[in-house]
Amino acid sequence: MQTPKKINLNLAWLGAAVLGLFGCASPPVPPVEAAPLAQACPAGVPEGARCLRGQDSASAHYLIVMPAQWSGVLVVHAHGGPTLGPPSTNRADEDIKRWVITVSEGHAWAGSVFRQGGFAVTTAAEDTERVRRIFVDHVAKPRRTLLHGQSWGAMVATRAAEMYPKSWEGVLLTSGVVAGPATYDFRLDMRALYQHLCNNHPRPDEPGYSLAIGLPKDSKLTAAELAARANDCLGVGKPAAQRTPEQARRLKTIVDVLKFPETSVMSHLNWGTFALGDVVEKNGGVSPLGNGGVRYVGTSDDAGLNAAIPRFKADPQAVARFAADVDHQGRFAVPVVSVHAINDATVFVEGQDTLRQRMTAAGHGGRLVQAFVDSREHSYWGDAHYPVLFEALLSWVEKGQKPTPAGIAQRCQQLQVARGAPAVGCAFVPDYAPQPLATRVFPR
């Protein structure tokens, strides 16, 4: 008969053995994905290309385009946005129309629509990895696999690069949201400053709410109605000559304080209303954004502004949940080329400084090359700029030839001339270096 001491020792040993087995257990095997089906290609896809469509095991729709003369390179694309509401199967068609240059260069293209609408970065990263596996399992085995994230899709791509480090051999980020949640702080600043100046979102006769939630879940406000309110207060829908002096003054205050052009006011106000509402809904009804302690500058009476502007406190748990879903640590195991327009008013170029700092702090600074374009465009800078970026990243991956901003600029011009196009189509600025994000977005 065993003594209690021996029984306890045996139980402890058994528990340790079970824990050891669980510790050594393999990660769950992903579900088997159905093969995609051949479908007609969207308009604009190069002649001879083959298009495949399907819906993955998590219900995300996707599109795969295989060029007639395949380079052996697969580019998995993470699209921008995010688009609020249910995902549209046509989203991938829109993406390939914009990024058909990828296929024209001979590379296969695969893009997921993402199964969740709105701000769901981790699940979008999972969908991105899933479409890569579908390509490998059912279409072809690429010699190289690159991950391309555009705009908000760069947030998805950085997440996917850290979640699935063995899936990618290089990462290209264009116009990317690469500074994490801090990228969006100024959208709450926009809401607070707008309400201070206009007091019509919400109106005094409407139920009040914390602006940090974007919009109450039961609100019926539409984008058109919001635009009408902004036009009443700021004259954003009118030529400058038709604005009242008071409208012009308010609009100038927003531009001076928040440091973006008047043409971007509505997009940022929309984000701070509808997209922020989606963020809050996905974070349990509380907001990860706040402006307590922010010191606003840029007016003739900054003290008066800071005393009067509405203030809101971020919920700590929402902050943690939001960061866990959308943020990266700069721990990328492969070469990263990140490119941004200097005057991008949608996603500020200063976020690139945060990317550099994070990768350096993580010990991966040597895996980053950044290039900058003399443009104010966010979505697409013109065909001249992208072939050289794919070429530079592939040369780095395959030959160990790390590109330089100057080399990218020079090679862009060479490729343009070789194609019989004017070299002036290239707008890279080799010696540009972005300032810290805190010089553009008020720190908190």
Label each region the model flagged:
Residues 21-23:
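C-terminal motif of bacterial Sec signal peptides marking the signal peptidase cleavage site
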Residues 144-199:
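Primarily recognizes the serine-hydrolase "nucleophile elbow" in alpha/beta-hydrolase
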Residues 69-70, 131-151, 167:
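Gly/Ser-rich "nucleophile elbow"/oxyanion-hole loop immediately N-terminal to the catalytic nucleophile
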Residues 72-81:
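Short beta-strand element of the alpha/beta-hydrolase
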Residues 46, 231-274, 278-291, 333-334, ...:
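Alpha/beta-hydrolase-fold serine-hydrolase catalytic core, especially in secreted/extracellular enzymes
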Residues 30-42, 177-327:
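Accessory cap/linker subdomain of secreted extracellular hydrolases
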Residues 338-340:
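Short beta-strand/loop motif that positions the catalytic acidic residue
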Residues 346-351:
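Conserved alpha/beta-hydrolase "acid-adjacent" motif
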